From Swiss-Prot:
Location(s), subcellular: Nucleus
Species in which this protein is naturally found: Xenopus laevis (African clawed frog)
Protein name, as recorded: Zygotic DNA replication licensing factor mcm6-A
Enzyme class: hydrolase
Zinc finger (C4-type): 159-186
Principal subcellular localisation of the protein: nucleus
GO cellular component: MCM complex; nucleus
Subunit relationships: Component of the mcm2-7 complex (RLF-M). The complex forms a toroidal hexameric ring with the proposed subunit order mcm2-mcm6-mcm4-mcm7-mcm3-mcm5 (By simililarity). Begins to associate with zmcm3, mcm4 and mcm7 into mcm complexes at the neurula stage. May replace mmcm6 in the complex that functions during licensing of DNA replication.
Bias (Acidic residues) ranges: 667-680
Location of the motif Arginine finger: 529-532
Domain MCM: residue ranges: 347-554
Stored InterPro entries: MCM, MCM6, Mcm6_C, MCM_CS, MCM_dom, MCM_lid, MCM_N, MCM_OB
């Protein structure tokens, strides 16, 4: 405002230059002296080379360290910190004068100053009105970014009455016209036109930031604030980034409130008829000026930088860091500890116990999650296709098996982890939502959980409770590690380089050992194949285990500090993770051959059907083995994947692929007392009772003579895999008969068909009798306990009107229409 058009009259000029800000002008002079005189540790002028950089057309901001300013002049630094918004334009003029002295600068080029290395950091909750105008540094997570727009900073207006140019009208965060024409003989106050060619514009971007989960007080809703970025600061952060913003808190008019139609007092007086009622009319003195009090707090940032890894930020996944740069960030003591950890022979076990000190047992799950935190090496092919390095883990188990505890531990430990519940999450909440900006009414992308966890871990609890349409939304994020959005005119592909740690409950609440993993979990095949590791936690009754768990829980409740036995502290593990993740191990020839050999074993075993896998073995399992091997190599700070790393990766993968051991089926368990009525349901679960318990169960029923007789002869048992094979054969035959002849088979016909099918395997009459007995018991079990087959019976009516089932010796059999045949 101090640049005045010379054509204006003396009176008008005197009116604009009445007040001089002496403090700000003194700051300008001292700041220019600082830029010209301050010397670095090497004795050279520190900011001279930076000033020469400003000659380039794309550069307009000088970055100044606040620590240097404090060393040079403590009083100047204090004044700038307390009165930043007031002196900021004068500091920018000092930069302009400094740049002019060191190069040929265009006349109309604008310059800005940005400060870094502020000593104190504030939370969003601490941004209150007493801090308005002072220099602050805040740390938060970006949740929404708006497109970059040009912003009118200083306008030149043309008076439409006398054609006088009114220059340098400062814009107060909304379109601001001159209050009156500067021509003394012209009284125009309203009719002005903006001359865009002579006005000054600057790049402008609006960003919404939100408190991080770690800073949030328990049970509170995260606070958010809008940040305004200008000039070189635009496009310096993306949704999901955790950044430090340096700038000042300012108050701006709430444009969305000001632009609400039909509520301004002056417009309502001109509206008549029905529309007048909608506009509410003038409401008297009570409503006068209410719209002019609509202001909001906004943070005007001059500098943005990603959160320093020393304080937690991109700590786990700073891929472009070298060992040397990480070493320089640590103190000597910290570095010695990291080196000592890398030499630890028992590192694998010690890291597991340090990460999950309050969870007893479940060592395999701990190892899998630990390798997930180290991660594999992301790769890119020559065609530009990226191969993910992140490891996805799913934990399936009965209630109270510490599934959610694992997720919570990872969320607290990992600096960039997002915890969400599957039931309460939608597809847009997990990936990204397209929302309308309340001011510009444009559509902008708001980050979801996977975007916020970019370069981190996304913990999803109750994964099986998610709707199918919401599960489909994360297919792309789990394999390609991107999120594609095409909605509301916005087409974008966003990064979601995140590991997914999911917890799911089995169908029906408890894991049924008699069924495969696919039948136990309510997940689609594509989702299951995208998980590298599946861990099954079964709540078994074991006296030794139960005692150990109970002892552990009681210890934790009574002596919390003493009972937690950590080998390394959480900060030490974090530092070690940061250091180990910069290794990019290569696969040696020996290891490559070993991986191929193990994969062939898995495929052959899957095809043979002898030890049936929990799900299909595909190339994804081969990639999983490679990623896990790289994670093991990283953990041991090795530049090469060795066969011992592959061996551990194969062992972990094998644990999750092999189906949970199922006990043999006892075909004699209820033979002596066939259920005459269907109320006897207590025996349905006997197939799942481990060996050695059947005698006790049968003895409870009160049939003492029969149970003694049963104890005398050995019970007829059948391998579970063989039982399923016979069951599938019978179901296929019955369905085939129904489809071809549209008739059902009697029980005896089905038994004869089966015996004929296996006649080549029968050598003696004794074996024939034995096989016939087995098939009879299998059909009996399929009808009465598994409910896979249904007996068709005739009904007769008595005179009383009651139905009585006529028991047939050889009933017709049909397959239960709800039964789905396993692959």
């Amino acid at each position: 405002m101090d640049l005045v058009d010379p054509s204006q009259s003396a009176a008008a000029a005197a009116g604009t230059q009445l007040v001089k800000d002496e403090v700000a002008e003194k700051c300008q002079k001292l700041f220019q002296d600082f830029l010209e005189e301050f010397q670095g540790s090497d004795g050279e002028l520190k900011y001279q080379s930076d000033a020469e950089e400003l000659i380039r057309p794309e550069r307009n901001t000088l970055l100044v360290s606040f620590v240097d300013l404090e060393q040079f002049n403590q009083q100047l630094a204090t004044t700038i910190q307390e009165e930043f918004y007031r002196v900021y334009p004068y500091l920018c003029r000092a930069v302009r004068a400094f740049a002019r002295d060191h190069g040929n600068i265009p006349q109309n080029k604008e310059f800005y100053v940005a400060f870094q290395d502020l000593p104190t950091r504030h939370k969003i909750r601490e941004l209150t009105t007493p801090r308005i105008g002072s220099l602050l540094r805040i740390s938060a997570q970006v949740v929404r970014t708006h497109p970059v727009h040009p912003e009118l900073v200083s306008g030149t207006f043309l008076c439409l009455d006398c054609q006088t140019l009114v220059r340098d009208v400062e814009q107060q965060f909304k379109y601001t016209q001159p209050s009156i024409c500067r021509n003394p003989v012209c009284a125009n106050r309203r009719r002005f036109m903006l001359d865009t060619n002579k006005s000054r514009f600057v790049d402008f971007q609006k960003v919404r930031i939100q408190e991080t989960q770690a800073e949030l007080p328990r049970g509170s809703i995260p606070r958010s604030v809008e940040v305004i970025l200008r000039a070189e600061a635009v496009e310096s952060c993306q949704a999901g980034d955790r950044c430090d913003f340096t700038g000042s808190l300012i108050v701006v008019p709430d444009i969305s409130q000001l632009s609400t139609p039909g509520v301004r007092a002056e417009t309502s007086s001109r509206v008549g008829g029905r529309e007048g009622y909608e506009a509410e009319g003038v409401q008297g003195l009570r409503a006068l000026g209410v719209r002019d009090l609509s202001y909001k707090l906004v943070f005007l940032a001059c500098y943005v930088c990603p959160t320093n890894p020393r304080f937690g930020g991109k700590e786990l996944h700073e891929e472009d860091m070298t060992a040397e740069s990480i070493k320089n960030q640590m103190s000597v003591k910290e570095w010695e500890k990291v080196f000592e950890m890398s030499q630890d022979k028992n590192l694998y076990h010690n890291l597991c116990t340090s990460l999950f000190p309050t969870v007893h047992g479940n060592d395999e799950v701990k190892r899998g999650i630990l390798l997930m935190l180290f991660g594999g090496v992301p790769k890119s092919t020559m065609e530009g296709t990226s191969l993910r390095g992140d490891i996805n883990v799913c934990v399936v188990g009965d209630p109270s098996t510490a599934k959610s505890q694992f997720l919570k531990h990872v969320e607290e430990f990992s600096p960039r982890a997002v915890y969400t519940s599957g039931k309460a999450s939608t597809a847009a909440g997990l990936t990204a939502a397209v929302v309308k900006d309340e001011e510009s009414h444009e559509f902008v992308i708001e980050a979801g959980a996977l975007m916020l966890a970019d370069n981190g871990v996304c913990c999803i609890d109750e994964f099986d409770k998610m709707d199918t349409k919401d599960q489909v939304a994360i297919h792309e994020a789990m394999e390609q590690q991107t999120i594609s959005i095409t909605k509301a005119g916005v087409k974008a592909t966003l990064n979601a380089r995140t590991s997914i740690l999911a917890a799911a409950n089995p169908v029906g609440g408890r894991y049924d050992r008699a069924k495969s993993l696919k039948q136990n979990v309510n997940l689609s095949a594509p989702i299951m194949s995208r998980f590298d590791l599946f861990f099954i936690l079964v709540d078994e009754c074991n006296e030794v285990t139960d005692y150990a768990i109970a002892r552990r829980i009681v210890d934790l409740h009574s002596r919390i500090e003493e009972s937690i036995d950590r080998v390394y502290t959480v900060d030490e593990v974090r530092r070690y993770l940061l250091f180990a993740r910069q290794f990019k191990p290569k696969i040696s020839k020996e290891s490559a051959d070993f991986i191929v050999e193990q994969y062939k074993r898995l495929r052959q075993r899957d095809g043979s059907g002898v030890t049936k896998s929990a799900w299909r073995i595909t190339v994804r399992q081969l990639e999983s083995m490679i990623r896990l091997s790289e994670g093991m190599a990283r953990m041991h700070c090795s530049d090469e994947v060795q066969p011992k790393h592959v061996k551990e990766a194969f062992r972990l993968l094998n644990k999750s692929i092999i189906r949970v051991e199922t006990p043999d089926v006892n075909l004699d368990q209820d033979d002596e007392h066939e259920p005459e009525d269907e109320t006897q349901e207590g025996t349905n679960g006997d197939a799942e009772v481990p060996n050695g318990v059947n005698g006790h169960v049968n003895g409870i029923n009160g049939h003492s003579q029969e149970s003694n007789a049963a104890a005398a002869k050995p019970s007829l048992r059948l391998n579970f895999a063989e039982y399923k094979r016979i069951s599938n054969l019978l179901v296929q035959q019955l369905r085939k008969m129904e489809d071809e002849d549209e008739t059902s088979q009697r029980r005896s016909e089905l038994m004869n068909w089966y015996l004929k099918e296996i006649e080549s395997e029968i050598d003696s009459e004794e074996e024939l009798i034995n096989r016939k007995q087995i098939i009879d018991k299998v059909i009996h079990r399929l009808v009465h306990y598994d409910q896979i087959l249904i007996e068709l019976t005739q009904t007769e009516l008595k005179g009383t009107g009651d139905e009585v089932v006529a028991k047939e010796e050889d009933p017709y059999l049909v397959v239960n229409p709800n039964y789905i045949l396993e692959d």
